[in-house]
């Protein structure tokens, strides 16, 4: 059984179900999942150590973020649970944002936009 403890876009759910042949049980939060978590083989979303303890069938924990440093790795290793996350999937977007911000600040476009909003007009040459 695949259980998501966080809401997921219905389009993504259908795509995953189609590719895996498994139904994904999506819940709005951890409280709603307490009855089904002991049977879950895959959990999507962050769960704490006390919840991991009660997941007797858990084989895979999929974290929808990059940060996993707060996970109880000793417990996960003892139970043989695989952990994956989404580290690195936004690399190109972050690089584009960084370049864009460098251009904005080097050319003082942020100041220009504030001045434009106030009705200021300057004819100074940008360097």
Model-derived segments and their meaning:
Residues 1-84:
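An N-terminal-biased, well-structured beta-alpha scaffold segment characteristic
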